From Swiss-Prot:
<dbReference type="GO" id="GO:0051260">
    <property type="term" value="P:protein homooligomerization"/>
</dbReference>
<dbReference type="GO" id="GO:0000001">
    <property type="term" value="P:mitochondrion inheritance"/>
</dbReference>
<dbReference type="GO" id="GO:0007005">
    <property type="term" value="P:mitochondrion organization"/>
</dbReference>
<dbReference type="InterPro" id="IPR045063">
    <property type="entry name" value="Dynamin_N"/>
</dbReference>
<feature type="region of interest" description="G3 motif">
    <location>
        <begin position="175"/>
        <end position="178"/>
    </location>
</feature>
<dbReference type="GO" id="GO:0005737">
    <property type="term" value="C:cytoplasm"/>
</dbReference>
<keyword id="KW-0378">Hydrolase</keyword>
<dbReference type="GO" id="GO:0000266">
    <property type="term" value="P:mitochondrial fission"/>
</dbReference>
<dbReference type="GO" id="GO:0061024">
    <property type="term" value="P:membrane organization"/>
</dbReference>
<dbReference type="GO" id="GO:0097753">
    <property type="term" value="P:membrane bending"/>
</dbReference>
<dbReference type="Pfam" id="PF00350">
    <property type="entry name" value="Dynamin_N"/>
</dbReference>
<dbReference type="GO" id="GO:0016236">
    <property type="term" value="P:macroautophagy"/>
</dbReference>
<dbReference type="GO" id="GO:0005777">
    <property type="term" value="C:peroxisome"/>
</dbReference>
<comment type="similarity">
    <text>Belongs to the TRAFAC class dynamin-like GTPase superfamily. Dynamin/Fzo/YdjA family.</text>
</comment>
<dbReference type="GO" id="GO:0015886">
    <property type="term" value="P:heme transport"/>
</dbReference>
<keyword id="KW-1000">Mitochondrion outer membrane</keyword>
<feature type="binding site">
    <location>
        <begin position="244"/>
        <end position="247"/>
    </location>
    <ligand>
        <name>GTP</name>
    </ligand>
</feature>
Amino acid sequence: MASLEDLIPTVNKLQDVMYDSGIDTLDLPILAVVGSQSSGKSSILETLVGRDFLPRGTGIVTRRPLVLQLNNISPNSPLIEEDDNSVNPHDEVTKISGFEAGTKPLEYRGKERNHADEWGEFLHIPGKRFYDFDDIKREIENETARIAGKDKGISKIPINLKVFSPHVLNLTLVDLPGITKVPIGEQPPDIEKQIKNLILDYIATPNCLILAVSPANVDLVNSESLKLAREVDPQGKRTIGVITKLDLMDSGTNALDILSGKMYPLKLGFVGVVNRSQQDIQLNKTVEESLDKEEDYFRKHPVYRTISTKCGTRYLAKLLNQTLLSHIRDKLPDIKTKLNTLISQTEQELARYGGVGATTNESRASLVLQLMNKFSTNFISSIDGTSSDINTKELCGGARIYYIYNNVFGNSLKSIDPTSNLSVLDVRTAIRNSTGPRPTLFVPELAFDLLVKPQIKLLLEPSQRCVELVYEELMKICHKCGSAELARYPKLKSMLIEVISELLRERLQPTRSYVESLIDIHRAYINTNHPNFLSATEAMDDIMKTRRKRNQELLKSKLSQQENGQTNGINGTSSISSNIDQDSAKNSDYDDDGIDAESKQTKDKFLNYFFGKDKKGQPVFDASDKKRSIAGDGNIEDFRNLQISDFSLGDIDDLENAEPPLTEREELECELIKRLIVSYFDIIREMIEDQVPKAVMCLLVNYCKDSVQNRLVTKLYKETLFEELLVEDQTLAQDRELCVKSLGVYKKAATLISNIL
């Protein structure tokens, strides 16, 4: 295990590693300096470094976070000696050795150095040492303007500066922009919000220590730095308070209660400092002289001399060093644990991306065949329901096909009413048209054929829709069955999908044609001898029962109306009673089966008529009946005397348009035909509901399952296509490259931490 003093340099190396890689997922221990403008932040930092190196001016000067790494080196450090042995101070360009053996020589451009044992380095200019701290100041200004612009805008991108000196303690601080309330000059209108959000991004992390700087000549209740610190650290466990400008307080006042923690308690306490005055800066007083003056001030002050050993910038530097060391020591085990987790997660992510792509023809052929097999296996298993990635939230794959067959298709067939588009007049017209100019003795079977065939065709549309829905579902399965490894090769994936889509399109039309032929087959031959087909006798019996029930309901309704009209008088009552007696007598002659004599007689006559003969084997209607039906109740002789010339085509059209009311015989004929249509349609509907899914499975689903592997190999397994198919997705390649880079950074960081734990 390394010494405690190695902790801060180790964290500095971790910060460098993270900065170089552009990865900020590791929450490293830092010490952020927060304060209002002109609160003395810059003076504290310069005093800690011992040199003037920060830009100064009015308004916002610090417009980007400055990560300041102070590295203590001994006067006899090999770094200095190596540098002196390889540097000619009069050269415009000088090369010096790196910090580690085997690294490229470093370069710097600049003037002759006055302090060879003190220098600064920027991470954005690797290999360049700044021995003149005025050059460091100018570089900070230039780098700030390069990213944040020349106006007064701010940026969250930090500037990383390393300072090597025998006169500093190992320390890492982040100088944040000063808090401002009112935009001045070219500052953005929301500058206060921007700065506050930037500061909170740093100090909100639990691993950040907060150095809250407050001037002594401003009431502590108005301290913006303490206000922000309290938002993220309400218990004051990781906040160090610094009271500046103690020498500028009003006469007779002091900050002893604040420094002793009585007014605003902080676990890490308050430290009072005296800043370098502007006069000292103008007189070019050294930082060392300012530090001696500060110590003399606290030692001789009547109030502060009792706590003088815990005041001043030198004490602040030691306190920050010790506090940061303890903080790092406490947080490093958690950081190591987090690093191990990140390494594991990154390795898993890298495994999903896969290794480096195939480079030889043999490896390409093997990879293409492997991905083809996996794709076709996923396609088949998704249909069969054996996939390992089955969705538990909704139906998918083969389950959706089953749902189409049994719910969508079945319900669409059941919703068809075969007689909804047939009126009674349509049925009567079909019966008439089927007989032509000839008179008929019974209902022609041709009329039934003419009417039932168009109704069977109503089953075609839902059947074709069933085929299309299954086709669309197979398309969805095809697009979703790609593996994560296949996502690396978008060209191969698109070609696999295209080949299967082409196979599905090829099978769609034969399936549609076969389903259409099923409908045509059932329309080609009407089998009235089907065992489930309703016989004429059964149909007629249903009709008569329906009529009897309707007559009973009409009778009840009539009786109810007559009872309600009894208030009309005795005569009315007698009349009603007479009518009731007549109706009762008419409807009382029911046989044991519930059929009245009149209805039974009508039924028997119509059945004999339907089959052409009565019980004696004679035709039911003779020529005189037909003549009476044509002539009506008028004079037959007048009808015979009519000449054909008395009729015109217009009269015939008028007769056709003015359809006479249906006779009882015609009503029975139409009702019988409609019932037979419903019976036969139900038989065909049941057959279609069973046959169409079988046809779709055979001609479309199973065919594609059996052919997909051979089709993929035939179309795509060609050596001339391998290189084109295995072109890797650029975005995914970049992600994998970033993943490899992150994994290297995490492992390097873990090694650094392991060396000191």
